[in-house]
Amino acid sequence: MTVKILVSGAGVAGTALVNFLCRSKHEYDITVVERAPALRAAGSQLDLKSFGAPLMRKLGLIEKVREKSIHETAFTFVDSKGREWARFPVNEAGKGYEGITSEFEIMRADLVAVLYEASKEVSANPFMKGPQKLRYVFGKHGVHFTQGNSKVNVVFSDGSSDDYDLVVGADGQYSMTRRLLWEPEKGSGDTTLKYTGVTAGFFQMPKSEDEADSTLFKNCLQAGPRGLCLRCAHKDFTQAMLGIPTTDEHKQVFKKPLEQQKQMWEESVGSFKWQGQRVLAELRKSDDFYMTPVAQVKVDRWSKGRVVLVGDAGYCPSVMTGRGTTVSLVGAYVLAGELAKHGDNIDAALESYEKVLRPFITTAQEIPSMGMGMFQSKFGVGVFYVLLAIISKLKIDRLLQALMKEEKETWELPEYPELEFEA
């Protein structure tokens, strides 16, 4: 029996899922629809932590990721005068406590491109157990779902419709799939989004002369709390990241034009003595600025009938955990593995997907307690910097790595012999 699958979203989770599905001994007819007219070129820097690198290695893609990786060497804290107070070196992926920056740092667009091209290659490989039928359709998305006993009828944005055995929502934190099926009632708002109290902004700007050879991720905190980060390791540009407390206005940000969104940041950015005026000037000129209230996605169950969520659409851990990419890869792997394991029994596969993955997601969504209240005042920020300096100088962060290693490995990545990977 050929299982007909619709995947909504051609981001990290969607393209990763297709790669894993194409290694199944079962036959799939897969359609991936993406709202954008092409693969999205925008996006910030991502990293592979814990199980992320091993999963890319299973797919035979780790060297391609390495080729595209950004050589970031350390995460530093600087004060308003640019003086460095603490430095934490890169963490080797999958080993010990997960640091802020890791061995595999890659731009989102590059990672998606690697997964996208690989999925097309493996789906057409006659030596795999498939081959699987695969097509990508851009500029299209689902707008209505009707569930039957074992099928889902999907009406698309272009007016067409079709039936599928399984629909996968891999369409990100603001998933249309989730909003259509998981909101308790129309007009109630997306109750599955749990805001963290921080709003983040991102954009790229030209490198300054002193950043030409820099491989550092620089971070400056000030009272408010407010944060300004510059990631300097990319050879072509510097990535600016901003963080401020969330307001109700931020939650309606998508209804505002880009220029109004940027104006919301001008006061906060301009208040930074370190790099503030430079970043403000570049912000005003930028055409790739993106802002979002930092939120997690939490739902009681990731599937409804024959519709299932994967990646940020179902369990976004937020940028504050630093594990979003890895969570998407793990979720895609487990979903594909359970589908392969249970064959035609899709309902059993979805039940097992929930049971196997839930403990990992619960841990992955834990946000470290930073005592945000201490950052409200200059004194509190100063105390935090002193603590960071002590931790960095005495290399206590390495001690934390050793002590927390066992805790990080309590959940084990399952093996699925039903998925065929190259030796």
Curated annotation (Swiss-Prot):
Main location: membrane
GO molecular function: FAD binding; oxidoreductase activity
Keyword Ion transport: no
Practical use: Xenovulene A is a natural product exhibiting little structural resemblance with classical benzodiazepines yet is able to displace high-affinity ligand binding to the benzodiazepine site of the gamma-aminobutyrate A (GABAA) receptor and could be potentially used as an anti-depressant with reduced addictive properties.
Cofactor(s) it depends on: FAD
GO cellular component: membrane
Cofactor comment: Binds 1 FAD per subunit.
Record InterPro entries: FAD-bd, FAD/NAD-bd_sf, FAD_aromatic-hydroxylase
Inactivation phenotype: Severely reduces, but does not abolish xenovulene A biosynthesis.
Membrane topology: Single-pass membrane protein
Residue spans crossing the bilayer: 371-391
Subcellular location: Membrane
Induction conditions: Expression is significantly up-regulated under xenovulene A producing condition.
Residues the entry annotates as binding FAD: 10-13, 34-35, 108, 290, 312
GO biological process: terpenoid biosynthetic process
Family per similarity comment: Belongs to the aromatic-ring hydroxylase family.
Protein name in UniProt: FAD-dependent monooxygenase asL6
Lineage: Eukaryota, Fungi, Dikarya, Ascomycota, Pezizomycotina
